[in-house]
Amino acid sequence: MNSISLPLDRNCQVIDYHPAGVWALNKATGVLSHPNEPNAKSPCILSSHFDVEEECYHCMDEKGKTHKIYLIHRLDSATSGILLLASNFALSAQLKNAFSKREVEKTYFSIVEYNGKPIRPYWKDFLQKKSIAGKIRVQCGRTGLMALTEVSLERKNYTKYGLLALL
């Protein structure tokens, strides 16, 4: 049984919990996966201490015992979606490894202006890391890592918007 009550940001929700100690959270737009800097004021998924070295939050259970809650992967602040956390270090390491080896399939959805023309079945571009105002940002460029992503138009309305899936 899960006796750890996660101190969630008010805009985030637990979608599911597995008894092995894995949480699936719905992370809202504008909420950080973890604090970028010590003493930062930006809202994070959990309002508890984050250990940068161990990549985990420190949360208390109902009896006052501190537990480490490991962040499995990250989502950018501007991205909403499912975020995984684990209370078991070995399991968190296995899951992180699966993400780093790209064994986990992810789909990103984007609402776009749609002009009715056919959509290319892929997006291909070079991505470059740049420092802008002291923050690392990724943007399209002439050099860098090649990004190749499948694209499909999932839904088109009779308005100017459509829903794209980036696989």
State where each predicted segment sits.
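RNA pseudouridine synthases
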Residues: 1-167
